[in-house]
């Protein structure tokens, strides 16, 4: 089966986005699917909700997007079998200046996911986005 990418996004806060992301990823993992959730929200609620301590987020999605780390090094285990996460930190809110000179910067994440064949080990990739309505809501 080819992997599926699911974006969980809404520009309004408080609509159940975190609950949906955590429950969907956990349910898929529970039936044996290999799941990667990428936390693209600087608040890091999906990361926290899946038990990733803030002190253990040295390689986050910020470092990946800013080309300071590769995607594979940022993937962390959760306490749930078959479920891994790339956590987020508040640093992600400052990613725009880092990408200002990048051509086609709106496609940065897509390039990373396709160029590195990073999703080959996963059946599903869930993109948990922020509430912000900006170019990098992914």
What is the predicted role of each segment?
Residues 1-130, 137:
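P-loop NTP-binding core
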């Amino acid at each position: 089966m080819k992997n599926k990418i699911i974006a969980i996004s809404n520009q309004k806060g408080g609509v159940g986005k975190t609950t949906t992301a955590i429950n969907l990823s956990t349910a898929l993992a529970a039936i044996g699917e290999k799941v990667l959730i990428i936390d693209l929200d600087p608040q890091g609620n999906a990361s926290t909700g899946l038990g990733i301590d803030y002190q253990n987020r040295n390689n986050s999605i910020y470092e990946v997007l800013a080309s300071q780390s590769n995607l594979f090094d940022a993937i962390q285990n959760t306490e749930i079998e078959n479920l891994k996460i790339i956590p987020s930190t508040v640093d992600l809110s400052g990613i725009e200046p880092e990408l200002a000179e990048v051509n086609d910067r709106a496609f940065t994440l897509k390039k990373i996911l396709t160029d590195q064949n990073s999703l080959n080990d996963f059946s599903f990739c869930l993109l948990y986005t922020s509430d912000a309505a900006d170019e990098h809501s992914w």
